[in-house]
């Protein structure tokens, strides 16, 4: 019985380690997309001076990674008095990230299964 307990504990620990590391694979890409979106949101807020959220905050956004890290989609509410969610896609080529301006981010999100997702939006 003692050997069985050790085996179950070992399997449980390995499972936790494997699931805990799944986001680590995309951490760099997510961080780059978040930094770019922070800059983008700050510019939008300065330019429009309306009800735009002043800063992008990762903890208020949903993050989706697709195609083995090729695309990172950030979904959040950029307007303080509006519940509409906006989707922003960053494409990665090598280590470089670029915002995809004329890309149907919401459609892509709806039609594809993410490799990784982090849903923080309230």
Language-model features: where?
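Extracytoplasmic electrostatic interaction patches
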Residues: 49-122
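C-terminal motif of bacterial Sec signal peptides marking the signal peptidase cleavage site
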Residues: 16-20
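Solvent-exposed, well-ordered amphipathic alpha-helical segments
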Residues: 2, 40-44, 122
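Alpha-helical transmembrane segments
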Residues: 11-15
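Bacterial N-terminal signal peptides that target proteins for export
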Residues: 1-8
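Post-signal peptide N-terminal segment of mature Sec-exported envelope proteins
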Residues: 29-48
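Bacterial signal peptide processing site
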Residues: 22-25
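Intrinsically disordered, low-complexity segments enriched in glycine/proline and serine/threonine
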Residues: 8-9, 80
């Amino acid at each position: 019985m003692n050997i069985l307990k050790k085996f179950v504990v070992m399997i449980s620990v390995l499972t936790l380690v494997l699931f805990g590391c799944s986001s680590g694979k995309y951490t760099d890409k997510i961080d780059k997309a978040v930094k770019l979106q922070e800059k983008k949101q700050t510019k939008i807020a300065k330019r429009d001076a309306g009800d735009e959220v002043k800063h992008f905050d990762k903890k208020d956004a949903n993050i989706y990674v697709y195609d083995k890290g090729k695309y990172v989609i950030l979904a959040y509410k950029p307007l303080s008095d509006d519940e509409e969610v906006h989707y922003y896609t960053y494409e990665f080529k090598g280590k470089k990230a670029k915002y995809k301006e004329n890309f149907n981010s919401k459609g892509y999100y709806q039609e594809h299964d993410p490799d990784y997702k982090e849903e923080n939006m309230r």
